């Protein structure tokens, strides 16, 4: 059943007649002292200022009441469960998507489908099996904070605690390449001489730093596409280009073969 929250107040409210108890408002307040109206020290029948409005919103009337223990700190929050015998209960909760993958720093949104469609209380509470990696922000929104697999996202109905689940995988955030710089920028070599280009990809923490090399004139100088090793073949000048796999960023080294 749905739960509401009230603040503890020192008011004492008189009990209503037993004949009016068609609904029961119950709640757990561990550590509360037993009173004359409590069958169990951890169970309370309560009514307090502000509670009437909340019950009215649920189309219920407050019934049994008891003394709010004045020895407890004023402002202490107590969760109250409302029992409605006429409610149409939730039978299933289905979370969509049932599997999802996201990256660190992203926010993903899930939805919960409640059956039957005319269930009285359709609200759900969202949670994850690892809040340090996937933190629930409410309303099915999760903040992805760290890499993880097999994380269970749950939607629990406030009526009956029916649970729907989805599985979430979180991968490292992709850091895009913004540029590449070849070194040296110019080079003079003899025929048959070799040297290897160095490529610096920016930013330093880019996810994919792969660079491919090409020669504008292989007859003058060749280059190994993977390693960047250049070899002079004939006299002349040739441009050797390095291009990143991510973003197609380029830089050029001008090679003179003498």
From Swiss-Prot:
Name used for this protein in its record: Ig-like virion protein
Compartment(s) of residence: Virion
Keywords: Virion
Any single GO CC term annotated in Swiss-Prot or TrEMBL for this entry: virion component
Pfam families with a match to the protein in the record: Big_2 (PF02368)
Source organism per UniProt: Serratia phage KSP90
Cited Gene3D superfamilies: 2.60.40.1080
InterPro entries: Big_2 (IPR003343), Invasin/intimin_cell_adhesion (IPR008964)
Highest taxon of the lineage: Viruses
């Amino acid at each position: 059943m749905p739960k509401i929250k009230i603040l503890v107040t020192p008011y004492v409210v008189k009990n209503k007649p037993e004949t009016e108890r068609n609904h029961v408002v119950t709640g757990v307040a561990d550590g509360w002292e037993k009173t004359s109206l409590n069958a169990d020290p951890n169970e309370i029948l309560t009514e307090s200022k502000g509670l009437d409005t909340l019950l009215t919103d649920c189309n219920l009337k407050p019934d049994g009441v008891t003394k709010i223990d004045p020895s407890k700190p004023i402002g202490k929050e107590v969760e109250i469960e409302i029992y409605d015998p006429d409610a149409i209960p939730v039978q299933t909760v289905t979370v969509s998507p049932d599997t999802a993958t996201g990256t660190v720093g992203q926010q993903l949104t899930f939805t919960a489908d409640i059956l039957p469609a005319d269930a009285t209380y359709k609200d759900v509470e969202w949670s994850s099996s690892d809040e340090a990696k996937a933190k629930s922000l409410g309303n099915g929104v999760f903040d992805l904070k760290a890499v993880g697999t097999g994380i269970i996202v749950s939607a629990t109905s406030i009526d009956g605690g029916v649970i729907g689940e989805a599985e979430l995988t979180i991968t490292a955030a992709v850091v895009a390449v913004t540029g590449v710089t070849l070194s040296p920028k110019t080079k003079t070599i003899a025929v048959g001489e070799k040297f290897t280009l160095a490529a610096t990809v920016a930013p330093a923490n880019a996810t994919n730093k792969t660079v491919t090399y090409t020669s504008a004139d292989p007859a003058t100088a060749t280059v190994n596409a993977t390693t960047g090793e250049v070899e002079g073949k004939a006299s002349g000048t040739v441009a050797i280009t390095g291009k990143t796999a991510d973003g197609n960023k380029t830089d050029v080294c001008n090679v003179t073969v003498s």
